[in-house]
Amino acid sequence: MSDLQKFVSDVGFTFIASAVSMLLGFPITVVLGRYLGADDLGLYRMVNTIFGTVMLFVTIGIPAAVIKYVAEFRDNDKKLGQIVSGGLITSILLGLISFIFIYVSASLFAAVFHMPELSGLLKILAFAFPFSVVTGMLFGLLNGLREMTKNAWISIIQSASMLIFTFLLIFNYGVNGAVVGIVFSYVMTTLLLIFVQKIPNLTFSNFSDNAFQLINFGSKTVLSNAINLINYQADILMIGYFMTKTDVGVYSVAVMFAKLIWILPDSIQKITFPLISEYHAKEMNGSIHILVDKCMKYSCLFLVFGTTFFIFFGNRVISLIFGAEFEHSYFPLIILLIGTVLYGITKSVGSIFASVGKVSLVYKIPLISAISNIVLNIVLIPIYGMNGAALATTISLIVSTVVMISFMKTLINIRVDFIWYIKVLFLSGLLICFFLSFKNLINDILLGVILQIIELTLFSVYFISNHDKNKMFHLFSIYVN
C-alpha cells in the first residue's frame, strides 16, 4: 500500500469511527434533554467538562508523547518497549492519583459551581479515572503505530458500550445512571485495548529516563492543551458559574452542534500528528508542505458545507430533536460556527509544531486567545448571557487561527493560499444571503436543499483539482474492487 493509500485509508477509518461514535453518543444527549430535561443535561455536561479538564492535567500529556516517540522509534523494538513500559506504568500511577483527587474534591467542585448534585456524580465518576488514563495512553500507542483500524473499531465499541450502559441505567437511576455508564465504558475499553493490542513485556530498564522523556515532552503539550481547553470549555464553565444548570444544558446543545463540523479535521489530525513526525525525522519537508496544504483545504470545504447546513436547517433540527425548551440554542450556535469553521481549517494540522519539535510554540500560540476568551466571557456573559459566551469563544478561536497561521508561515515556511479560501467563503456567503432573502417566499427546506446541492457541485468543480479528483476516483476504485 502506497503512502497516499495508507493516509486515505487511515483518515477514512478514523472519520468513520468518529462519525459512528458521535452518532452513538448523540442519543444520550437527546434522551437526557428530552426525558430528564435541561437541568439534568446541564449537570451531565458539567460532569463531562470537569472530567475532560481534569483528564488533561493528570495525564501530563503522556498520550501525545507516546504518539510522537512510538512513531519515531517504531522500527527499534528495544526502544519501543521501553517507551511503552514507561508510558503504561506512569499512566497507572497517575490514574490512581486522579481517583483520589476527584473523590476527595467532589464537594469542593459542587460548592464552586453552586450545584450540590455535582458532589455525588463526581464521586461516581472518580472510578473512571484510573481506566481512562490508561486508555488514553493505549490509544496513543495505536496512533503512533498507525494502527488506525484497531483504533477505529475500539473507539466505536467504546461509544456503543457507553450508549448501552447509559440506556440500561438512565431510566431507573437518572443522571446518576448516565455517569455510571461512563465508568463502565472506560473499564471495558481498557480491558479490550489490553486484549487487542500486543503490549511489549513491561520493563524497568531505563524507566526513569524514558518516563522523564515522556513527561518532559508531554508536559509541554499539556499547557497548550490546557489553553485550548479554555477556548473550548471556558464558556460552559463560566455559564455554570454565572448562570444556571438549565442555561448550561441549553448552551451545551449549541456547542455540541458547533463542534460536530470538526469531525473531519479531528480525524485528519490523528493521522497527521504521527505522519508529520515521521516526515520531519526523515527531513521530508516538501511532503509536509503538500500534506498541510491538502488537509487544510479539504477541511475547509467540509467545514463550510457543514456550517451552511446548520445555518439553513439548524433551528428545525434543534426543535425536532430536543424540543421547544432548547430553541434558544440556535443563535449561540450561529455565532459559534463562525469561530469553529475558521479555527477548524488549521485544526487538521494543529499538532504540526509538536511534530517538528517546536513544542514551546504549542502552548505559546493559543495563550493570547485564551486570555482574551477568559476576559471576554467574564465581561459578556453577565450582559448577554449565552450569546455573550458564544461571541467570546468565537473571537478567541479566530485569534488563535490568525496567530497559528502566522507562525506556520514564519517558522515552517508553510504557504497559505488565501485567495482560494476567500473564494470558498465568498461563494458560500452568497448562497447564505440568497437563502435568508428568499426563505419566506419559497419553502425554506426545499430552498436550502437546492442551495446545498449547488454549493457541493461548485466545490467539486472549482475547488478540487482534476489531479486530486482522479486520485480520489482511483483510490475509490481500488477499495471497491
What does each of the following model-derived ranges do?
Residues 1-3, 7, 191-232, 271, ...:
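Interhelical loop/hinge segments that connect adjacent transmembrane helices in multipass membrane
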Residues 1-25, 78-81, 85, 208-224, ...:
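N-terminal membrane topogenesis motif
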Residues 6-67, 95, 99-103, 159-163, ...:
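Signature of the first transmembrane helix
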Residues 20, 52, 89-227, 233, ...:
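Hydrophobic transmembrane helix module of multi-pass membrane transport proteins
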Residues 33-41, 145-149, 159-191, 360, ...:
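Membrane-interface helix-loop junctions in multi-pass transport and translocation proteins
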Residues 71-89, 250-366:
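Specific pore-lining/lateral-gate transmembrane helices of multi-pass inner-membrane transport
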Residues 130-154, 337-368, 410:
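Membrane-interface junctions at transmembrane-helix termini in multi-pass inner-membrane proteins
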Residues 433-481:
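Membrane-proximal transmembrane or re-entrant/amphipathic helices at the cytosolic face
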